[in-house]
From Swiss-Prot:
Domain of life per record: Archaea
Gene name linked to the record: tdk
A Pfam match: TK
Protein name: Thymidine kinase
Subunit structure: Homotetramer.
Binding positions for ATP per the UniProt entry: G15, S16, M17, F18, S19, G20, K21, T22, D91, E92, A93, N94
Class of the enzyme per the UniProt entry, highest EC level: transferase
Species assigned in the record: Halobacterium salinarum (strain ATCC 700922 / JCM 11081 / NRC-1) (Halobacterium halobium)
């Protein structure tokens, strides 16, 4: 793979929950910091599982982050929050509105490396915008896989469980949770109730 070095670019790390997306994002941030690059991290206000101003992984690793409201206005404020950082990390991109795509384009055009992580599918197995749009404009895309909690195969789906049972198709899309409300599942074991 030829690395881009003369301009900004966009990287997307995606996949199901528990696939290591945030771990990979944190790894890239650590490498950028070791290389002497200034790093800024952003996380949505809806995800406070690991602390108010923290980008955190299920494995317990974390990074200080600026909390941004997941609104058009909040996303538009991201460039104004920066102080010359060359690397901008955005975790849980799926919780931000479509305006995030234009902001990432702007940051990359300004010569910055933009690294995003977020799941590309809802619990229904449908596209979770704006991540698919971000994947389309990105120079680099990595799709991570977890392990299916039912059969052990590679998992690419988010199984939402409510009181231990698969969620209904009509349940709300956004519901921040951890192991008690979601499991990684493969295509064959993924269930969405429609009755």
């Amino acid at each position: 793979m030829h690395a881009i070095t003369n301009s900004g670019w966009v990287e997307v790390i995606t996949g199901s929950m528990f696939s290591g997306k945030t771990e990979e994002l944190l790894r890239r941030l650590r490498r950028a910091e070791i290389a002497g690059q200034d790093v800024a991290a952003v996380t949505p206000a809806v995800d406070d599982r690991y602390g108010e101003a923290t980008l955190g992984s299920h494995a317990g690793r974390s990074w200080a982050a600026t909390v941004v409201e997941p609104t058009a206005e909040g996303v538009a404020s991201i460039p104004t929050l920066l102080n010359g950082e060359q690397v901008v990390a955005i975790d849980e991109a799926n919780f931000f509105p479509a305006e995030l795509v234009d902001v990432c384009q702007e940051l990359a055009a300004d010569g910055r490396r933009v690294v995003l992580s977020g799941t590309d599918q809802t619990f229904r197995g449908e596209p979770f915008e704006p991540v698919p749009q971000l994947m389309a404009i990105a120079e680099y895309v990595d799709k991570m896989r977890a392990i299916c909690m039912q059969c052990g195969e590679p998992a690419t789906r988010n199984q939402r469980l409510i009181e231990g049972e698969p969620a209904h198709y009509d349940d709300p899309t956004v519901m921040v949770g951890a192991e008690e409300t979601y499991e990684a599942r493969c295509r064959n074991c993924h269930v969405v109730r429609r009755e």
